[in-house]
């Protein structure tokens, strides 16, 4: 008898030479779904969840959790405002479910909810610091994304936006295994990000603008207008003696990264262990941008008698160097890189940096030498769990988890910088997040003939404390920048905490592994709400029918090898993001008219209550000839009692400008609906060659269904939040092309009459209208994995169709002409496409004229359709007969590349995987990375 894990046992006759080919056992290899409150076979799971393929986690070297998920899970979308190493990414599961209370999913590590999001909220960089960047992705065993209420409702108020369940590696019974992994690589921009005209092309364009100014504003003759342009062009586009300056080349560089990890695992029938240590160093594509990380992880499980104890400990230290990027803060380097004129010279004749050059009067090379933004994070996540096996069907467990994170952010503008003059400014922000979780669970699993029951009761507490200290010093007498050396200092402290107490239960029943029923209930009490509204109840009911086992399908079972219909309905909730929104808040330390006092910084709303998410899902799982599997889900998600920060009058007594003049109200409703499709196939499989393919696609429709009942829209710049429309809709004048006689921009009237599609060059006659939305119509990914003998190849494409973005920054270049004439010019301003004179009917861009202001219109609306080679990995495993003599069980070398190719609209000058509202500013673009590595197992 010959057997192997995951293979069917076979009996063979004993002979001198025997050749045996074991067949896979689909039941043993069946995919499981880890929910945090239990592990289920996918065949018996009644909800909607996706699990990332184990080989994807193991073989593809990436540095973030988001990169592990990208392109592999239907219905999960990603956005980022920066590719600064360690920066925050936004992850959305089935759209957005809130306005002000947060849209990020709940992250659960080894069964415990953890702190997530941006920890460095008081810095001057758009990048932020993702607390999950402290997690070593090589320690991850599996990732499951829970999308509907069937399992998510057990997490109650924290899971309205989905749950990402991360299971870290643990020891396995068998000999001790030592694994070493190391990789190195480099990175650059994934696309030609915001290309600019070179010096000569820019000079030609500006000369044309000056001439047109003379012709159409100065009423000059053609010859006089040309002379006028010749006389003034040197003021705007003079060529330096050292040649044109390429600011993009000066401010950006190739990034690099290196990663080293050593892990040891093993165990016996009583004790299992896994431990690892890792070091990561990543340099960004902007000088002084990078991340350095040390991590340690230990997981120990020990059985004694009727007890089992499990201890996990994760520690990390992260040092993140950031650079200011967009337009909202002082010294934004990425902003400068695309605004500086090629006529500006960064260096003086003696080789020193030339301070004061450029459109903003700031030399970005000078600023970066005299400023810094460094964030240091210390994080520890420790758990201990004791399980008592009361009898073989009944278990009682108690778990305590402590999640600790402390960060220190040092921001410096020294005495020589423009922002720090004359004496320098240093700011230090120290923030701390503590979270203590306790979980008590009683679980019961039993079978009675064809009846199978899996039930759980639980009690949980969560205590969270957040504190920060802000200290600032200025007027330094020298170049030693510590707070104690400052001529003057200021400080501010804050501490806040909240508690949540929860009772929960679930029961799953199935008959003959054919008919399934699931029930769950949870009630949460949160100190973020007034006593009258403190408790919220969340529940779900789900069912499934595994119809493949019905006799009437016997004739087609040779083709249809599995089939299951699923349905679920449930209610989740979201609590306010503010800890004390229901209370009146005051702040001391305010100076008014030379007297100390206090100010109002929060207006109470004791009626504030939970947001409610009501979700239903219907799904179908099919398998054909044991090679092709299809999963289809349709869902509808309605959010009511939306928490919205309603503006209030400042006359009421608000004094401190650091706090918004708003009060939270439950005033709105949102609706998300859509479908998800995943098709997985084993295209070919024999003893030497295997080829599998997975395709996923998703559509989500998001609409705002209610505001406060009195107004039906809120306008914010080019965005509008209007009832009946997607939340991120663009509301501007509709561009109608170029007037052939005057060369001016034309706009559609959109006045609601029969003249709506008539055009005008007078923008005051036109009306704004919704011209697009950021939400894509279809998004998804395509993954192929091939293995031939000792060579493996995997690649993933991601794609998106039907969305729009608003290129705010290209419009800024044209605003009043001042940026164009003082700084850089985007290649968008193609002189060959511009109006040349009366009767020009071929122009797609209006007349270019000095001082002319371009209007905020759909001219700046760009399609976000794209297809991207998200990842490609090629590995070679050295055959066992070569490495066994060296004491190795595995030796693999590999190459991996991410964002290698991107196909997108030529009109989109930024990366298509952008921030969630689609407003394009100046961020560090997505990176194309090349990684070379080696993996050794002993």
Which sequence ranges carry the predicted segments?
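Repeated loop/turn-to-beta-strand initiation elements of outer-membrane beta-barrel proteins
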Residues: 270-273, 306-309, 393-396, 450-453, ...
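Transmembrane beta-strand segments that form the barrel wall of outer-membrane beta-barrel proteins
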Residues: 182, 277-283, 517-526, 683
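Active-site phosphate-binding and catalytic loops of NTP-dependent enzymes
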Residues: 77-81, 153, 548-556, 882-884
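Residues on the lipid-exposed face of transmembrane beta-strands in outer-membrane beta-barrel proteins
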Residues: 168, 180, 262-266, 296-302, ...
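Conserved C-terminal beta-signal and adjacent last beta-strands/turns
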Residues: 263, 692, 773-801, 854-903, ...
């Amino acid at each position: 008898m010959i057997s192997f894990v995951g293979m069917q046992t076979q009996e063979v006759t004993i002979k001198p030479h025997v050749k045996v080919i074991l067949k896979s056992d689909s039941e043993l290899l069946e995919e499981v779904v880890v929910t945090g409150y239990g592990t289920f076979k996918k065949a018996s799971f009644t909800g909607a969840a996706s699990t990332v393929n184990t080989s994807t986690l193991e073989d593809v070297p990436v540095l973030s959790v988001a990169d592990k998920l990208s392109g592999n899970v239907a219905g999960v979308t990603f956005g980022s405002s920066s590719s600064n190493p360690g920066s925050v990414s936004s992850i959305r599961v089935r759209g957005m479910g809130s306005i002000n209370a947060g849209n990020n999913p709940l992250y659960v590590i080894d069964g415990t909810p953890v702190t997530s999001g941006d920890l460095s909220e008081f810095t001057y960089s758009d990048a932020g610091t993702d607390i999950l960047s402290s997690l070593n992705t090589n320690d991850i065993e599996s990732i499951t994304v829970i999308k509907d209420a069937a399992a998510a409702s057990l997490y109650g108020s924290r899971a309205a936006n989905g749950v990402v369940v991360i299971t870290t590696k643990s020891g396995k019974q068998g000999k001790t295994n030592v694994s070493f992994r190391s990789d190195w690589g480099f990175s650059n921009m994934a696309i030609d990000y915001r290309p600019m005209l070179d010096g000569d092309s820019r000079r030609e364009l500006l000369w044309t603008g000056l001439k047109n100014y003379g012709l159409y504003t100065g009423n000059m003759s053609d010859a006089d207008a040309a002379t006028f342009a010749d006389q003034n062009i040197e003021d705007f586009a003079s060529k330096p003696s050292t040649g044109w300056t390429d600011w993009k080349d000066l401010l950006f560089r190739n990034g690099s990264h290196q990663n080293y990890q050593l892990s040891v695992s093993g165990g016996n029938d009583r004790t299992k262990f896994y431990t690892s240590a890792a070091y990561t160093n990543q340099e960004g594509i902007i000088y002084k941008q990078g991340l350095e990380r040390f991590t340690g992880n230990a997981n120990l499980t020990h059985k004694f008698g009727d007890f089992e104890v499990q201890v996990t400990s994760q520690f990390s230290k992260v040092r993140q160097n950031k650079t200011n990027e967009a337009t909202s803060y002082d010294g934004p380097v990425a902003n400068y890189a695309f605004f500086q004129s090629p006529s500006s010279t960064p260096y003086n004749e003696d080789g020193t940096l030339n301070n004061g050059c450029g459109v903003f009067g700031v030399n970005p090379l000078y600023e970066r030498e005299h400023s810094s933004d460094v964030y240091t994070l210390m994080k520890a996540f420790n758990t201990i769990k004791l399980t008592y096996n009361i009898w073989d069907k009944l278990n009682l467990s108690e778990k305590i988890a402590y999640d600790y994170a402390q960060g220190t952010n040092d921001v410096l503008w020294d005495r020589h910088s423009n922002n720090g003059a004359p004496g320098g400014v240093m700011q230090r922000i120290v923030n701390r997040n503590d979270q203590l979780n306790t979980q008590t669970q009683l679980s019961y699993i039993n079978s009675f003939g064809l009846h199978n029951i899996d039930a759980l009761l639980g009690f949980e507490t969560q205590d969270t404390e957040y504190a920060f200290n802000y200290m600032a010093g200025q007027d330094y007498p020298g170049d030693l920048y510590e707070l104690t050396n400052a001529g003057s200092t200021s400080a501010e402290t804050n501490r806040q905490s909240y508690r949540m107490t929860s009772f929960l239960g679930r029961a799953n029943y199935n008959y003959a592994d054919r008919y399934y029923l699931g029930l769950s209930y949870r009630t949460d009490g949160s100190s973020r709400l007034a006593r009258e509204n403190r408790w919220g109840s969340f529940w779900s009911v789900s069912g499934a029918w595994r119809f493949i086992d019905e006799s009437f399908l016997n004739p087609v079972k040779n083709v249809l090898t599995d089939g299951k219909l699923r349905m679920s309905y449930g209610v989740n909730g979201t609590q306010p993001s503010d800890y004390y929104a229901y209370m009146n808040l005051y702040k001391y330390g305010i100076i008014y008219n030379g007297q100390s006092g206090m100010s109002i910084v929060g207006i109470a709303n004791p009626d504030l209550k939970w947001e409610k998410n009501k979700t239903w899902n219907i799904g179908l799982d099919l398998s054909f000839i044991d090679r092709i599997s299809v999963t289809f889900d349709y869902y509808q998600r309605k959010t009511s009692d939306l928490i919205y920060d309603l503006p209030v009058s400042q006359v009421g007594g608000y004094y401190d400008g650091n706090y918004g003049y708003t009060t939270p109200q439950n005033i709105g409703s949102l609706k998300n609906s859509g479908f998800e499709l995943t098709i997985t196939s084993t295209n070919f499989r024999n003893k030497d060659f295997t080829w599998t393919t997975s395709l996923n696609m998703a559509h989500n429709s998001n609409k705002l269904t209610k505001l406060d009942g009195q107004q039906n829209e809120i306008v914010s710049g080019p965005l509008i939040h209007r009832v009946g429309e997607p939340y991120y809709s663009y509301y501007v004048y509709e561009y109608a092309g170029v007037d052939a006689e005057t060369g001016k921009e034309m706009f559609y009237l959109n006045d609601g009459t029969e003249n709506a599609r008539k055009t005008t060059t007078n923008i005051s006659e036109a009306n704004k209208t919704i011209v697009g939305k950021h939400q894509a119509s279809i998004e998804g990914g395509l993954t192929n994995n091939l293995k031939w003998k000792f060579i493996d190849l995997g690649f993933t494409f991601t794609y998106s169709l039907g969305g729009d973005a608003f290129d705010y920054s290209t419009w800024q270049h044209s605003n009043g002409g001042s940026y164009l004439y003082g700084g850089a010019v985007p290649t968008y301003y193609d002189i060959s496409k511009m109006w040349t004179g009366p009767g020009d009917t071929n122009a797609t861009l209006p007349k270019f004229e000095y001082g002319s202001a371009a209007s905020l219109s759909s001219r700046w609306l760009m399609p976000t359709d794209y297809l991207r080679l998200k990842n490609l990995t090629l590995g070679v495993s050295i055959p066992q007969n070569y490495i066994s003599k060296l004491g190795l069980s595995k030796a693999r070398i590999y190459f991996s590349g991410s964002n290698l190719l991107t196909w997108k609209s030529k009109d989109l000058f930024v990366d298509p995987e952008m921030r969630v509202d689609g407003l394009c500013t100046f961020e560090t673009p997505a990176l194309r990375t090349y990684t070379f590595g080696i993996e050794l197992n002993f």
